[in-house]
């Protein structure tokens, strides 16, 4: 029974990772969005060729928006960060 649960967990993790990666467009500029919160996030700066910090307002924006620099690197510049 534990093996079945482990396999199901692995499959769900893979499916979630694949679906997250599909909607990311690393060519978009950073986009704060319309809200007024102050969240430090990371975006891939295509001109600079690296992930950089920006302030996210908490809503809207675009898919070039990551919680960590590591997440940004994995999605947009694997092997370079």
Swiss-Prot record:
Q: List the disulfide bonds.
A: 26-76, 35-59, 51-72, 73-81
Q: What is the predominant subcellular site recorded for this chain?
A: secreted
Q: From which residue to which does the signal peptide run?
A: 1-21
- Which tissues express it? Expressed by the venom gland.
Under InterPro entries, the record lists: Kunitz_BPTI, Kunitz_BPTI_sf, Prtase_inh_Kunz-CS, TFPI/VKTCI-like
Can you list the GO cellular component terms from the UniProt entry? extracellular region; extracellular space; host cell membrane
The compartments listed are: Secreted
Membrane-crossing residues?
none
Every copy of the BPTI/Kunitz inhibitor domain together lies at 26-76
Q: Which Pfam families match?
A: Kunitz_BPTI
GO molecular function list: potassium channel regulator activity; serine-type endopeptidase inhibitor activity; toxin activity
Is Secreted among this UniProt entry's keywords?
Answer: yes
- Give the record's family classification: Belongs to the venom Kunitz-type family. Scorpion delta-Ktx subfamily. Delta-Ktx 3 sub-subfamily.
Q: What does this protein do?
A: Multifunctional toxin which inhibits serine proteases and potassium channels. Potently inhibits plasmin (Ki=8.75 nM), trypsin, chymotrypsin and elastase. Also inhibits mKv1.3/KCNA3 potassium channel currents (IC(50)=371.3 nM).
Could you tell me which PANTHER family the record lists for this protein? Answer: KUNITZ-TYPE PROTEASE INHIBITOR-RELATED, TISSUE FACTOR PATHWAY INHIBITOR
Record protein name field: Kunitz-type serine protease inhibitor BmKTT-2
Q: Which organism is it from?
A: Olivierus martensii
Q: What is the lineage of its organism?
A: Eukaryota, Metazoa, Ecdysozoa, Arthropoda, Chelicerata
